[in-house]
Each structure stands twice: as C-alpha cells, then as structure tokens.
Amino acid sequence: MKLNTLAPAAGSKSAPKRLGRGIGSGLGKTSGKGHKGQKARSGGYHKVGFEGGQMPLQRRLPKFGFTSASKRYVAEIRLHELNNVVADEVTLDTLKDFGLIRKDIKTVKVIASGEIQKAVSLKGIACTKGAKEAIEKAGGKVE
C-alpha cells in the first residue's frame, strides 16, 4: 500500500450536485430553489435568528449573569500537581515552565486535592488553608 494509491471505499463518496446544468440533470433551470420568492434570489435569505418580524427568542428571554474579565487570568492548581515540579521553590514562572498553567495566567491558587510527597516552597502563590497545612506537614513552606 502506498499513499498515492489510497482511495475512499467505493460508494462512500457521492458526486457534488451540479446545479443549473439542464433539465436532464434533475437540477436544471431553478437549481432546486423553486419559483420566485426571497429564498430563490441570489443572496436572499433572512439573517440567523430572524422570525419574520416576531420578537426573536434571544430577545424574548431575559439577560442574566456577568463574567469577570480578570477571571480569565486566574488558575487553580491541585496539591498533587506540585509533585510534577522538579524545583524546591515554586513560583508562577516555574509552574508555567512545567506546563501546569497557561502562559497568560497572572494569579494561581493551590487547592487541597490529592497529596504532596515532597517539600516545596511556594513563593507568590496563594493557597487554601488545607493546602498550606499539607505543604507544611510535608516539610515545605508558604511565603
């Protein structure tokens, strides 16, 4: 088998519809658009969500909620993920280097999920009460 001999299975691909190519094709003259009307014209169709002048659904339903723009740059990291960091001092940059958080993250919080097996020193990183206790119990410290 060679890449240049690969072909789809017989009957798995259908030929594209050739519109407006004579009455024998079955899609001649009006090309499957019927007679007249807005939808038969070139470029003619209503915009998405238009309901013929009736108040559209997305305007009938109430607005709600709010998404903080700064929330995009905040991340949570679990306690057991700190085991993957091969460094004694854990900062925002070391977490980025080891691929635990995205490059655009500005604030991180360590949460108590899982167990930590080694002593690490957190610098400039927030953590929950439970996570702080677990880190200090493992011989690490939070600064």
Swiss-Prot record:
One of its GO terms (molecular function) is structural constituent of ribosome. It holds the Pfam family Ribosomal_L27A. The keyword Membrane does not apply. InterPro entries: Ribosomal_uL15, Ribosomal_uL15/eL18, Ribosomal_uL15/eL18_sf, Ribosomal_uL15_bac-type, Ribosomal_uL15_CS. SUPFAM superfamilies: Ribosomal proteins L15p and L18e. Residues 21-31 have a biased composition (Gly residues). Residues 1-52 are annotated as: Disordered. The keyword RNA-binding applies. Belongs to the universal ribosomal protein uL15 family. NCBIfam families: rplO_bact (TIGR01071). Binds to the 23S rRNA. Part of the 50S ribosomal subunit. This is Large ribosomal subunit protein uL15.
